[in-house]
């Protein structure tokens, strides 16, 4: 079952009762940035990630890395601090460098791929490796892709 981690706590609890592992996207620790790019703030998302960790439930964190949006030292450090503070760490953190593979799919469906026209770029290999290093410095397991 697919659900959004910004659903109600009851929904999150129900999903945990019926699944073995959660894959959770964490796009930005800055609620304003999250609101700008995702149209919703991140407080409920962070609260539900904490809820999953406190339930001692296995989960992966997926962080899409977008140059100029969230692939920077400040956001990754804040993400690492938050995740390292939880009673159960994610099994792994998958850093997902931005790509535009979905552009063709959106065109076929008649939808707009980037409706707000943001400049979306893949971070350099160097930036990706710096992000991995920050996360591992906090005792977290991280990889590119996943």
Question: Which positions does each model-derived feature cover?
Answer:
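Conserved radical SAM core fold
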Residues: 6-9, 22-40, 65-68, 100-102
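Glycine-enriched alpha-helix->loop->beta-strand junction motifs that scaffold or abut catalytic
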Residues: 16-22
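Generic structural signal for hydrophobic
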Residues: 14-15, 52, 83, 135
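Auxiliary Fe-S-binding modules of radical SAM enzymes
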Residues: 67-146
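Conserved strand-turn element in the central/C-terminal portion of the radical SAM core barrel
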Residues: 33-36, 49-79
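Hydrophobic faces of well-ordered beta-strands that scaffold small-molecule active sites
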Residues: 22-24, 59-61, 91-97
């Amino acid at each position: 079952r697919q659900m959004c981690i910004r659903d109600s706590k009851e929904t999150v609890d129900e999903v945990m009762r019926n699944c073995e592992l959660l894959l959770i996207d964490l796009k930005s620790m800055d609620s304003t940035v999250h609101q700008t790019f995702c149209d919703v703030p991140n407080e409920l998302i962070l609260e539900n990630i904490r809820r999953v960790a406190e339930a001692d439930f296995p989960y992966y964190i997926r962080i899409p890395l977008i140059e100029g949006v969230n692939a920077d030292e400040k956001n990754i450090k804040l993400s690492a601090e938050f995740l390292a503070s939880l009673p159960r760490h994610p099994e792994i953190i998958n850093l997902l460098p931005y790509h535009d593979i979905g552009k063709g799919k959106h065109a076929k469906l008649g939808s707009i791929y980037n409706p707000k026209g943001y400049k979306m770029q893949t971070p350099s290999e160097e930036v990706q490796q710096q992000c991995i290093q920050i996360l591992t410095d906090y005792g977290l397991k991280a990889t590119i892709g996943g």
